[in-house]
């Protein structure tokens, strides 16, 4: 599928990178990724999504750093972090290598997927009641 445009958005071809990791690894992984690519989306950077923690299941086999075990391990608080990168092979190789260097696992699980991602055309939404900046949420600056 190729990119396309609507009145409000452009759909751009990118790579979605997903990494499974213990929650305590996430800041280190994202710092390494952000040092190579700022993960920019319009007027924002450091754009990524982190799932809630889940349970990872695995059994170390011969050759594993922990040595072979007979029981399946169940590790809590493993999350998935996803972000988008341009389709640049050199950048992708550097990002994958950086993740491998800072991840705590012997075999980090990293998946790649071709995706189309939306990019706003920057429409004037100052009167749109559905935009957070036009509501009274706690993120609005307090008036004196």
Regions inferred by a protein language model and the residue ranges of each:
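Hydrophobic structural segments
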Residues: 1-144
């Amino acid at each position: 599928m190729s990119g396309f445009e609507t009145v409000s958005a452009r759909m751009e071809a990118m790579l979605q990178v997903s990494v499974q990791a213990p929650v305590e690894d996430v800041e280190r992984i994202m710092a390494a990724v952000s040092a190579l690519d700022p993960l920019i989306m319009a007027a924002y950077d450091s754009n990524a999504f982190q799932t809630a923690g889940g349970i990872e299941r695995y059994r170390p086999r011969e050759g594993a750093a922990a040595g072979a075990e007979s029981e399946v391990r169940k590790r809590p608080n493993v999350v998935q972090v996803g972000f988008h990168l341009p389709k640049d092979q050199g950048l992708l190789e550097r990002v994958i290598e950086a993740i491998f260097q800072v991840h705590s696992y012997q075999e980090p699980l990293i998946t790649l997927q071709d995706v189309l991602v939306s990019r706003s055309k920057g429409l004037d939404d100052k009167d749109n009641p559905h935009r957070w900046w036009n509501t009274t949420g706690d993120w609005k600056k307090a008036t004196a």
